[in-house]
Amino acid sequence: MTHPSAPRARSNGKEPEKEEPRCVHPDLTPLNVKDLDNKSSSAITNENVSSPTLLPFTERLSAIQPQIPNLLALKEPENGKNKHPDSEQDDGDMKEQRSKNLSPESDDPLLDHRHLQPGDTVSLLSHKATLQMYRDNAKKTNDPMLSYELAVFMLDVSRSLEFSQQMLSRGQDPAAESEQLAKEAMSILRRLADRGHVESQYLAGDCCMNGYGMSKGRPDLGLAYSYFVQAGKRGHPDAAYRAGTCYEKGWGCRRDPAKAVQFYKMAASRKHPGAQYRLGTAELNGELGLKRLAREGVKWLKRSAENATPEFPHALHELALLHEKGIYNVLFVDNEYSCELLAQAVEMGYAPSAYKLGVNYEYGRMGCPQDSGLSIHMYNIAAQQNHKEACFALTSWYLVGVPGILPQSDTEAYLWAKRAAEQGLAKAEYACGYFCENGIGTPRDLGEAKGWYQRAVEHGDNRASSRLNTLSGYTAKPVGIAADEASAKNLPQAIPVQPLSAPFPSAAPISTMRTLGVANYPTPKTMKETQAMQRDLHQQALVAAIEEREKPKTATPTSPQGPSFFGQKGSQGRPSEKPFSPSQPPKEGGKPMSLIAAGPRAGFPKPPTPPPPPPPEPEPDADAQLAANPKSFKSRLLRLGKMGKIRKGAASEGAEGEDAENVAGLEVPEGEEPLSATEKVPDGNEAPKSAPNADADKETGLNKDPAGVGEGAPSPKPETGAMVLSGPKPLGQARGQPPALTPGPSGPSSAAGADGAPRLPGEPKQHTLGDSSKPEAADKMSQEATEKSKDVNNEKSKNKKSEKSGGLSFFGLGKKIMNKGSDKPGSEDKKNQEVPKPSDEASPSIAKPTDTPAPLSPRPDEKNSSLVERSKDSESTSPSSPKPTTGSAEPSVPPMPAMPPSTVVRPSPSMALVPGRLPAIGAPDRTESNPVPASPQIGGIVPSRPPPPGVRPVMPGTMMTSRPFPPGARPGMPPNAQPGARPGMPPNAQPGARPGMPPNAQPGLRPGMPPNVQPGARPGMPPNVQPGARPGMPPNAQPGARPGMPPNAQPGLRPGMPPNAQPGLRPGMPPNVQPGARPGMPPNVQPGARPGMPPNAQPDTLSGLPLNVNAPEANNMLQLHPSAASGVRPPAALQPSLRPGPRPFSPTFPSPAGPSRPNPHLLPGVSSSSDGATPRANGHGVKPGSPPSMPEQHSFAPPAMQPGRPPSPSSPFGRPPTGPFSPSAVRMPRMPSQSSMHQSGNGPSPPKPGQMMNVSLPARTNQPHLGGASPRPPRPTSPPPFLTSQQPNRPPVPRGVMPPGSGPSMRPPQPPAIIPPPPRSPPARVNQPSLGPPGSSMPQGRMDMPSGPTAQGQSPLSKAMVSPPKMSSPDRPPFAPPTHVTPPKTPAKASGFSTPDSSSSKIMEFKDAESDNLNFGSATTTENAAAVGEDKSVRKKWLGFL
């Protein structure tokens, strides 16, 4: 490698010294000198270089990479780089190619100064020399890019002169020189902008906007706006964005949001992130005249985030905030993606995003881990950009410090708070005032503190006002930016401190790691060592505390439910009421050892210490208790086999020494203490001293013990897991057999294990901790003690019958409370004491204990000794005391009545209870708040008293909280009820039965059903009916049959059809008719023919009247169409009116005036299909003046209930009307209003000339001209003639009238003169009982004919005169619907039944079934009428019961 200072070889007679300044100049060091030297050395090897001066310059141009991409930064072509300098032609080609890239006026490569660009390469030459070179080039050439480059360089120099005053001053004013350079650059830019140079226009507009290079430094917004608009229209994205900003803010122009949006979209289309962000926020907030569209706004924000730059990272931050909360149906919540967007913005240096991430890392939000180091780092990035919230956050961190990351410094905390307060943060101003008032991080200055408090009050901090009151006597000093500027040289500068050992790259220079606080900070190494020592000491303290707590424990785990559940010695380590947690490490030498042994240094904060937990409870010293009373403790544990009595006596004698007689069960004279000091129960559980009577026994044995639960507890409620002692030993248990496991309130316990642990039969006995004697010695001592106590116990058993002393025993084994209150368990105490029971009659089966049961007492170190003390108030029954007495301290309290045997739980075969003998239930005393616990799994009883008010009775062997019934039973049930039964059910009811059902009812039945009914049947059905049958069907009907069908009918048939009919036929058709025929047609008619046609007629032929009209058809036609020659005229109100209505109507729904007000202009017809209704119930009308009833489902009314259709005589709807006239559809001439109505499209097509018009009444309204909305399809018509019987008083039918069931196409054209015009009369209301003459049997028109079932032998109108209609009667028929002028479209159906081709057949059946109408939209047969009435009465009966 050739050194740059080495001399060069001669070339073309030129000295190499002339080239030395170009190659050895010290300012060339930033360039790649290695590449230059290598290339120049390669050129030196060739002596035939024609132009040596071009080679270093050419290679240099190819090596320099421009810093700012613009049009001046043109790279050399590839052929120019790789040309070898040997040939002259190659060098000429290179010069020619380079001249093309330069200005056309100059071919001299020396004039190309593209390597002299503003930025880092400016230092290659001095400013003065570089400016001179640029000026020379600009004068010699007219290239706009070179002039633009000169202007840019001048602006950069003018700005950098402020920071290099000492370098360029030399007697000149740098400010004046800078202003002169700026003005010169601005003149060049304006000249280029006028010539149309886009870059110059934008840069000139920016200078005018900032006032740079302008006269007096004032901005010219109008000139800037014009330059921005010109450049923006030429496609400059930044200029378009700035032009949109001018239009939005009104800078240099009038505000025009539409123009602003136009320029923003122009810039956004060229991927300008600022314009895209502004459009996104405008769409989200509905600004700039745009609609508020969140989806479009999010789209613009996403595009801006994709094109984000360090100058415009705002979209990343906003999009992250949107993902944090989400936008409904637009943007979902994604915390992880939100943090990722924030991190991208932080990489671009966006301060708000850095602060947001700092908060997340400090508090662990948005899925970020809680990291102090990262939080401080993010706060530092934001604080370097003077983010006020981040500066104040650093104040908080400096106040507490982070070991190993950030040292604690009050000075740094004050400086950062001051920086935040200078930017107007109210809480930072208050903090600065507090620091100055108390001298934290700064000298105490109350005047300055008052000044900060005043600024905080001005910015809305209410806490500063109270502080100002305390500083009323001081003068506030000026604080803030003004005071800092005045004394900027005297105040220290806030230098951010780089966190120590931070898990992130350094964001501050190394020189800024020095702090301004106390100089005696601990080093990171010292801090780590101190923290390690603290952790070790704390760990050692915890380990020592755990070992101390687990000393009395063994390897056997302790049960949380009981002291002796897991095995031997488990009760010794029974956990106390409060868990043990040491508040400090063990003491050494009587002084507590501090956790921070090293101690904090000056400036090092103490670590925050947790609040001290409550002091631990002292653990009972089992060894001391066993040493003080080892024999007595062991005697209460060894109780197995026939030697239990001897062992107990020997242990009692060895336990007390001189008091052995008292312990063995001897009488103690009054005034003597039966127990020694060492015999007392620990933890304050003392045995009662004396109990001369029941009252004294209650005071000493029950109320005196204050520590039933724990130490110092006032309530005698037993602790969880306490041992439970209960009544006598069950039958069948040998004396040597261990008692069964007895679960206490929290778990089972045993009476036969050492240390209270359960021991199964046959398990060897265990020795407990502290046993100083062997079993052999214990047996020997027991024998001696037993021999001494035999006579005394036998004498005492004779006098004990009259004494009242209560106590609990474990199968008859346990301590006895003597009349003096001594704790003396005797071998024959079971014979000498009476056990109070409810009554002998109530519990005759209580098992009597054996002759010599071994006593049982709990361990003295257990805290549940209060249970034993309280259990002494009741004693199990002995053979010598057959008469029971109550164990209550108050003899006046009666015992609780005995519960039935079903309430006694028998979980094991060891429980033996005679069926007639039951345990008593009650509480130990009315004055106690907690009962005596007992075991529910022992066969004995717990003598007790009735429970106090508000307390549940106690089951034997259970806590007070347990229920006095078996586990499967519920409260409020009898004792002998089964577990699955519910309250309110008889005891012998089955578990699956429901309340309110008889005991012998089957489980699947429902209330209100007879016991012998099948489970699948429904309420209201006879017992012998099949499960699949429905209500109203005979019992022998098949499951698939429908109501109203005979029992032997096939399942596929429909109601109203004979049993032998074919399944495909429809109702009302004879059995021998063909399946394709329609109802109402003779059997031999063709399938395609329609009703009313002769059998030999063609299906589509329009003929006159049928030729073979038989008597039934004539009767049916006579019923619906009376002749004028009969002499019988209908009432005036029922005569049709030829006056048309004011407007066509379509009464689909009832009018608002009422559901049953027909239009008086028209008569009811057979083709009614609207939802009008007549207020009929049970076959009677409405009283005069009564309001109309509420309409029911009128569209589902059966055809037999339509106006103008009488019911069949065989149907249960009632007898046929007795009147001679039945109003029906009459043939009327076609009126103009009718034709206009049909043409309007609201009704069906008009009938052909000569056909009959069926006119029916609509719903009655106050306005006769108003009708419904749209017509409904016509309803099925009356039954065919062959299913209706001959009715009297029927005039012959005229030949000109068609049956109502015939379709419109089958009606033969008849001259209108055949039907005589009815007399004109004023229209009157129908559906009123007053229309007919009083006392007459003629109904008020067929519209009001009853269509529901009536009582047999009762006229349809007989009941209507005395009772109003019922709104919810079960047998109320649907109202007869009003009709409109519609020719019938469906043929007549037999018996009025709905057919499959009717749209409402299924709905009609469903509706009738819901309204308890057993007719299912039709008239039932005569043979089923009685069954229907009977079934309805049965249902009424059951409904009344429910």
UniProtKB/Swiss-Prot annotation:
Disulphide connectivity of cysteines: none
Listed Low complexity bias regions: 747-758, 876-891, 1295-1305
SMART domains: SEL1
Renumbered residue ranges of the record's region Disordered: 1-54, 72-117, 550-1402
Recorded topology in the membrane: Lipid-anchor
Assigned GO CC terms: plasma membrane
Keywords: Cell membrane, Lipoprotein, Membrane, Repeat
Compositional bias annotation for Basic and acidic residues: 12-25, 75-99, 762-804, 821-840, 859-875
Keyword DNA-binding attributed: no
Amino acid composition bias (Basic residues), ranges on this chain: 633-648
Subcellular location: Cell membrane
Free-text function comment from the UniProt entry: Activator of the chitin synthase CHS3 which polymerizes chitin, a structural polymer of the fungal cell wall.
Full protein name: Chitin synthase regulator SKT5
Species name: Malassezia restricta (strain ATCC 96810 / NBRC 103918 / CBS 7877) (Seborrheic dermatitis infection agent)
